[in-house]
């Protein structure tokens, strides 16, 4: 709740989805369309000067996909369109003129192909993607503003960019050895530069029937979001001259895979360039804004390990304990925040994370899921003008469900121990909360 006692983490949502398909002798076609509405109190997530923020989002999405059924050659085209409408209220219900309205449209075309020969599998294709935004706050001034439906306000800012990419990949599969190598060439109208190339290699070797080792090297690019480029309001100051993030990722690991036990251990090293972040200098006072910046270089080393026990494989489908899994992850970055500098993303991360989960069959279709999580986050947050370090915390969740063929009834409780903790920024996370519901699957 906010300081006035009103709700500031409430939410209401509705969704609708349709999917159809056609199966022919030469081609299969799938299509879908959906809509979702969500209204939610966003607490102090976007800024600390208001604890009564609110957001309304509406999303439309549709796509058509096809695949030919040739013996050696397959063609997989798809076309999609997504629209998102957003109204953000920094001060909930204080008037339309203070709100931030935005509408994004993403239109894309994928042309994927692959050919299978005695030399392996060769995949190639292209993607064309256009994304645009019109807004009251984000983007460059528009020559022709667009009316916002339902209110006497115009979208008077916007930005549009198109991405083109072409990819080529070849995979060789031998009895115990697999090698895949490829490259992506990409060009975006936003940065005005030519095509850039991003290679990748994946290799694996079967040591024994149940043991496999693997290694990979991949490169990637991420463009700054519209928010990172233009969000300048309520304690935030964006930089529209941000550069795109670039990443080189190395990973190696070993897997043990059987029907009853699955275990994996991996080590990775990421070399990041121009990593995008929001930072704030607390030494300059509470009015100092968050600023979007590029970190010139940021290297990350990590370890992940997990094991899953499927007890149904050993004692049958009616086992009381159906399965149990536990995982651990560790991350270390070679750049730390400077004194009084608070980071939202790049320099704020989970140093340690432990997750344990089990699924129990209580009776017939009555099941219980229990989940335990322990996290230790690196970074700082500000509260009441003070800089605080994150503290480790433990969470326990449970979900009880009756799982029938066409319907499901459930009740779940999160943060059963009612822990007080901060997981991002200076926003206190909810204590214990319970919800119940039902789902039903219609067959047409």
Feature-to-residue mapping (PLM):
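C-terminal beta-signal and adjacent terminal beta-strands/loops
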Residues: 272-274, 278, 374-381, 389, ...
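Transmembrane beta-strands of outer-membrane beta-barrel pores
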Residues: 1-3, 24-26, 35-39, 70, ...
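Flexible loop and strand-edge segments within Gram-negative outer membrane beta-barrel domains
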Residues: 2-13, 27-106
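Outer-membrane beta-barrel signature, preferentially recognizing the C-terminal barrel domain
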Residues: 47-70, 192, 206, 212, ...
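Gram-negative outer-membrane beta-barrel transporters
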Residues: 173, 177-178, 269-271, 293-382, ...
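Short loop/turn motifs that connect adjacent beta-strands in outer-membrane beta-barrel proteins
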Residues: 26, 68-74, 116-121, 175-176, ...
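Surface-exposed extracellular loop regions of Gram-negative outer-membrane beta-barrel proteins
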Residues: 1, 13, 28, 36, ...
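Outer-membrane beta-barrel transmembrane domain signature of Gram-negative proteins
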Residues: 98-180, 345-347, 359, 371-373, ...
